[in-house]
């Protein structure tokens, strides 16, 4: 049981949480402030 707790507390869980939060942050930034490539398509 201690080995399972050690495994779950190291790299897989930490990297999953980090990349998940980073992806969510990038999605929200691109939703609120879209980059310049999409401006000509929405400025009719």
Curated annotation (Swiss-Prot):
GO terms for cellular component: chloroplast thylakoid membrane; photosystem I. The keyword Membrane applies. GO terms for biological process: photosynthesis. Its main location: plastid. It comes from the Eukaryota. The keyword Plastid applies. It is a single-pass membrane protein. Keywords: Chloroplast, Membrane, Photosynthesis, Photosystem I, Plastid, Thylakoid, Transmembrane, Transmembrane helix. Pfam families: PSI_PsaJ. The chain crosses the membrane at residues 7-27. It is found in: Plastid, Chloroplast thylakoid membrane. InterPro entries: PSI_PsaJ, PSI_PsaJ_sf. May help in the organization of the PsaE and PsaF subunits. Belongs to the PsaJ family. This is Photosystem I reaction center subunit IX. The gene is psaJ.
């Amino acid at each position: 049981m201690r080995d399972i707790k050690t495994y779950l507390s190291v790299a897989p869980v930490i990297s999953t949480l980090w990349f998940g939060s980073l992806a969510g942050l990038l999605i929200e930034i691109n939703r609120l402030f879209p980059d310049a490539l999409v401006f000509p398509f929405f400025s009719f």
